């Protein structure tokens, strides 16, 4: 059974398929089309947003047997070998495990040999910021005047740790985190292609908790599919992410705003028994209060993904409470979240934050 995880199956194979990096894709594609090819590229950004994918696409574009192109054919031997990770002229190096200067010199000594069957030897150095100072010095000498048949693509999640002298010798591209909306649309597209049932609210939750990373979103989606036995629904997503179930956001916020201490404590005990993390309680209440506040301040155009029940809960609390109380509640809970790490325990921190709201409003 040759099952491919979603992150690999849906890895972009053309520059045009890359999500959320239009400014970078356009610059690289135009450079390839015009024949303005640099000897080194540096890609920086958080995890799972396309650095390695762009690096491999560059390797394919430079070595495609149909010529240097921004649109590799994927049919020639070189393209196929690069996609399978079998091309001997594309050398992927993990900077985190090859930090010693001796190892870097050994690698750099090989650059003077001609490519075996490709147009260029392409060195992809991932997590390049992990290299030692001496390794950077060795790399710098090569980056200054590399052989014509050699190209470098460097990738990092921490560009501040890379010497300025290295950066100045590369075409530097800073990748952006992917917007929640773009991740949501991509997940929806994948599930349609995979013929998997879902609801948009579940995908929105996954997109939010991916924190701008496509790879993280796909891994969460994979988990949700397995948990739901081939389906994705909000209950499984809520359980998987350890989120506060929607109904408790309403009940807890309502109890606090009604200054009902007893009900508040009973609800907290109930919520803790289902395994929700204490900080998550404050996060979900803050998000709920945000929606209440915006619905009070201006006519809110509700997103289609919100359930009718959720909208009704928001509107009910918004109509029955003063704007100042909602704002004060938000401020106290926000400060409570900041102070959570200083509390004797997270349980005590959350309880005291809610009791502080009840005393203040």
From Swiss-Prot:
One of its GO terms (molecular function) is ATP hydrolysis activity. It is an enzyme of class 2 (transferase). The keyword Nucleotide-binding applies. SUPFAM superfamilies: P-loop containing nucleoside triphosphate hydrolases, post-AAA+ oligomerization domain-like. GO terms for biological process: DNA-templated DNA replication. Disulfide bonds: none annotated. Zn(2+) binds at residues 64, 73, 76, 79. Keywords: ATP-binding, DNA replication, DNA-directed DNA polymerase, Metal-binding, Nucleotide-binding, Nucleotidyltransferase, Transferase, Zinc. The keyword Transcription regulation does not apply. InterPro entries: AAA+_ATPase, DNA_pol3_clamp-load_cplx_C, DNA_pol_III_gamma-3, DNA_pol_III_sug/sutau_N, DNA_Rep/Repair_Clamp_Loader, HLD_clamp_pol_III_gamma_tau, P-loop_NTPase. One of its GO terms (cellular component) is DNA polymerase III complex. It catalyses: DNA(n) + a 2'-deoxyribonucleoside 5'-triphosphate = DNA(n+1) + diphosphate. Its EC number is 2.7.7.7. SMART domains: AAA. It holds the Pfam family DNAX_ATPase_lid. ATP binds at residues 45-52. Belongs to the DnaX/STICHEL family. DNA polymerase III contains a core (composed of alpha, epsilon and theta chains) that associates with a tau subunit. This core dimerizes to form the POLIII' complex. PolIII' associates with the gamma complex (composed of gamma, delta, delta', psi and chi chains) and with the beta chain to form the complete DNA polymerase III complex. DNA polymerase III is a complex, multichain enzyme responsible for most of the replicative synthesis in bacteria. This DNA polymerase also exhibits 3' to 5' exonuclease activity. This is DNA polymerase III subunit gamma. It comes from Buchnera aphidicola subsp. Acyrthosiphon pisum (strain APS). The gene is dnaX.
């Amino acid at each position: 059974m040759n099952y491919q995880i979603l992150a690999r199956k849906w890895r972009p194979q053309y520059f045009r398929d890359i999500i959320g990096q239009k400014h970078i894709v356009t610059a690289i594609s135009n450079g390839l089309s015009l024949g303005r090819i640099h000897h080194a590229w540096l890609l920086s950004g958080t995890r799972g947003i396309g650095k390695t994918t762009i690096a491999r696409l560059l390797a394919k574009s430079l070595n495609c047997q149909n010529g240097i192109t921004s649109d590799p054919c994927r049919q020639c031997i070189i393209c196929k070998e690069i996609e399978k990770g079998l091309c001997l002229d594309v050398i992927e190096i993990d900077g985190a495990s090859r930090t010693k200067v001796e190892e870097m010199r050994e690698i750099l000594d090989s650059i003077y040999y001609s490519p075996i069957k490709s147009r260029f030897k392409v060195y992809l150095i991932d997590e390049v910021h992990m290299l030692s100072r001496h390794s950077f010095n060795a790399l710098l000498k090569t980056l200054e005047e590399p052989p014509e048949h050699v190209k470098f693509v460097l990738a990092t999640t921490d560009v501040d740790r890379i010497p300025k002298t290295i950066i100045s010798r590369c075409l530097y591209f800073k990748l952006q985190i992917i917007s929640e909306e773009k991740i949501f649309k991509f997940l929806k597209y994948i599930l349609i292609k995979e013929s998997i049932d879902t609801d948009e609210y579940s995908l929105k939750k996954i997109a939010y908790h991916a924190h701008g990373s496509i790879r993280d979103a796909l891994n969460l989606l994979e988990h949700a599919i397995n948990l739901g036995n081939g389906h994705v629904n909000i209950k499984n997503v809520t359980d998987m992410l350890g989120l506060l179930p929607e109904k408790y956001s309403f009940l807890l916020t309502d109890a606090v705003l009604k200054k009902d201490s007893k009900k508040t404590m009973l609800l907290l005990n109930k919520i803790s028994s289902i395994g929700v993390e204490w900080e998550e309680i404050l996060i979900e209440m803050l998000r709920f209060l945000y929606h209440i506040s915006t619905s009070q301040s201006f006519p809110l155009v509700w997103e289609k993904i919100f359930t009718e029940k959720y909208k009704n809960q928001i509107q009910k609390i918004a109509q029955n409470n003063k704007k100042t109380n909602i704002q004060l509640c938000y401020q106290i809970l926000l400060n409570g979240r900041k102070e959570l790490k200083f509390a004797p325990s997270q349980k005590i921190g959350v309880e005291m934050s809610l009791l502080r709201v009840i005393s203040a409003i």
